[in-house]
UniProtKB/Swiss-Prot annotation:
Lineage: Bacteria, Pseudomonadati, Pseudomonadota, Betaproteobacteria, Neisseriales
Protein's name according to its UniProt entry: GMP synthase [glutamine-hydrolyzing]
Subunit structure: Homodimer.
Gene that produces this protein: guaA
Residues annotated to bind ATP: 225-231
Organism, as annotated: Neisseria gonorrhoeae (strain ATCC 700825 / FA 1090)
Signal peptide start and end residues: none
GO molecular function terms listed in the Swiss-Prot or TrEMBL record: ATP binding; GMP synthase activity
Keyword check for Transport: no
């Protein structure tokens, strides 16, 4: 199926992928590539328009230059922050360090233009935006006009109406820019003329065809974790190749309470997929003994998964592929996306824990989808809502929710505490009757391998501490800690301390992302 496409060239901003998400929300297909994508590949991609992302560097650094031939393709170009500076610099304007950095909220006064017409916030011809820049455009290129300014940035927006080139010094992709989505939609839909044909039914059709082409008659093994991503991946691959897919559900001793039974029942009842249940708790615990470094734990868990899959592969004579539920944020955090300049934060279990000598080829049908798109895909594939809207669970399971060394004792305590937390979130509603489980995007307990003094009855206790974590996010790229009611937190704390022998203190994590990540390890 032929569809209109937008190309995003990434200069290294940590929020570039939000641009892709906003474009897809307009039902237009887009791809994100490194800023140095060769011009012949750009031409072959045949985009309706190009978006140049922000980035942390200066236009005067030679290592961060895109092919300026993009300005000769006869298609609209939108430069965001660094992208605007790159456009101005290479088209004859001037860029210089600002007298003061602009970071955070700003109000832009706009002039009527093809990009801004009819788009404003509370006051006429004003936009509430999010800035993050030091350098700024100090002189316009020929053919450009100013269409927006702030007191400290006289050229905050610029336009070449004839060539349909636009530059904006702020970030429309972040939610802090109130009309950011409207501006991006104006560029993508109206200026570029892209037709909104990218929908989940269309995506399923294309993904199924691609999987069939990749796999052929080979057999595929997929590891089920019980989480949303692997479940949706299994449904999509099963739609494409049916019984060529065998799912391997590995019980590594790091699952949530009663999860093994739930996963087996759910897949047998709802999907009809072949599932092999492997009890490997002893194998995983032995390998993790004495290991405290989170990166080493992740890689050990990844390596042990591969060992398990290798053992199962020998039983499947035609197995050639290992399928995973890797999604876009996983790839981004590991700096493994199609761009070269992302900054590595931590290795993800789906992309950073694979041994170099892995015998199976990798199949990752969800790697270009954001979490909300994965859920939408799951619903379109007919999966039950309770499965699709379950909170994310990491592949290493409780292994990255137990700080430091992983022990069976710790896992058993954490399982119980986590289950109590989730129960209370499901059973407690806000004033509109919505459960706090549905109001939060991800919630879980974390085991801290430290003991604190407590008093229970007439006796002194010296037991472990559990931290509760709950966040609200639309894309898992950034997140706010959930402001849960004190009464809810109090009930959770009381139940954990009274029902889980070995825990005598419960704390609540109030860190956002950034600066913290959602998972503790």
């Amino acid at each position: 199926m032929t569809q209109d496409k937008i190309l995003i060239l990434d200069f290294g901003s940590q929020v570039t992928r939000l641009i892709a998400r906003r474009v897809r929300e307009a039902h237009v297909y887009c791809e994100l590539h490194s800023f140095d994508m060769p011009l012949d590949e750009i031409k072959a991609f045949n985009p309706k328009g190009i978006i140049l992302s922000g980035g942390p560097n200066s236009v005067y650094e030679s290592d961060y230059q895109a092919d300026t031939g993009i300005f000769d393709l006869g298609i609209p170009v939108l430069g965001i922050c660094y992208g605007m500076q790159f456009m101005a610099h290479h088209l004859g304007g001037e860029v210089q360090p600002g007298n003061q950095r602009e970071f955070g909220y700003a109000q832009v006064k706009t002039i009527d233009s093809g990009l801004t017409r009819g788009i404003q916030d509370d006051a006429p011809n004003t936009l509430d935006v999010w800035m993050s820049h030091g350098d700024k455009v100090s002189k316009l290129p020929d053919g450009f006009a100013v269409i927006g300014d702030t007191p400290s940035c006289p050229i905050a927006m610029m336009e070449n109406a004839e060539k349909q080139f636009y530059g904006i010094q702020f970030h429309p992709e972040v939610t802090h820019t109130k009309q950011g989505r409207a501006l991006l939609n104006r560029f993508v839909l109206d200026i570029c003329g892209a037709q909104p044909g990218w929908t989940m039914p269309n995506y399923i059709e294309e993904a199924v065809a691609k999987i069939r082409e990749q796999v052929g008659s080979d057999e595929v093994i997929l590891g089920l974790s019980g989480g949303v991503d692997s479940s949706v991946a299994a449904a999509l691959i099963h739609r494409a190749i049916g019984d060529q897919l065998t799912c391997v559900f590995v019980d590594h001793g790091l699952l949530r309470l009663n999860e093994g039974k739930m996963v087996m029942d759910m897949f047998a009842r709802n999907l009809g997929v072949k599932v092999i249940h492997v009890d490997a708790e002893g194998q995983f615990m032995a390998k993790l003994a004495g290991v405290t470094d989170p990166e080493k734990k992740r890689k050990i868990i990844g390596a042990e998964f591969i060992e398990v899959f290798d053992a199962e592969e020998k039983k499947l004579t035609n197995a050639k592929w290992l399928a995973q539920g890797t999604i876009y944020p996983d790839v981004i955090e590991s700096a493994g996306a199609k761009t070269k300049k992302a900054h590595a934060i931590k290795s993800h279990h789906n992309v950073g824990g694979l041994p170099e000598n892995m015998k199976l080829k990798l199949l990752e049908p969800l790697r270009d989808l954001f979490k909300d798109e994965v859920r939408e895909l799951g619903v379109a594939l007919g999966l039950p809502r309770e499965m699709v809207y379950r909170h994310p669970f990491p592949g290493p399971g409780l292994g990255v929710r137990i700080l430091g060394e992983v022990k069976k004792e710790y896992a058993d305590l954490l399982r119980q505490a986590d289950d109590i937390f989730i129960q209370e979130l499901r059973n407690t509603t806000d004033e509109n009757g919505t459960s706090w489980y549905d109001l939060t995007s991800q919630a879980f307990a974390v085991f801290l391998p430290v003991k604190s003094v407590g008093v229970m009855g007439d006796g002194r206790t010296y037991d472990y501490v559990v931290a509760l974590r709950a966040v609200i996010t639309s894309d898992f790229m950034t997140a706010h800690w959930a402001e849960l009611p004190y009464s809810l937190l109090g009930r959770v704390s009381n139940r954990i301390i009274n029902e889980v022998k070995g825990i005598n203190r419960v704390v609540y994590d109030v860190s956002g992302k950034p600066p913290a990540t959602i998972e503790w390890e």
